Amino acid sequence: MELLIQLTSLLLIVIAGPLVIALLFLKQGNL
């Protein structure tokens, strides 16, 4: 069960990471 939680958290980090960076770049570009 812990392995599944670790995999899902890792997947969230892998997906959310680039999204947050893209949002930051968009905000800087709009300014």
From Swiss-Prot:
Protein family: Belongs to the Psb30/Ycf12 family.
Membrane-crossing segments per the record: 5-25
Entry keyword Membrane: yes
Location in or out of the cell: Plastid, Chloroplast thylakoid membrane
GO CC field: chloroplast thylakoid membrane; photosystem II
Lineage of origin: Eukaryota, Discoba, Euglenozoa, Euglenida, Spirocuta
Gene Ontology biological process terms from the UniProt entry: photosynthesis
Domain of life: Eukaryota
Swiss-Prot/TrEMBL keywords: Chloroplast, Membrane, Photosynthesis, Photosystem II, Plastid, Thylakoid, Transmembrane, Transmembrane helix
Gene symbol of the encoding locus: psb30
Name this polypeptide is given: Photosystem II reaction center protein Psb30
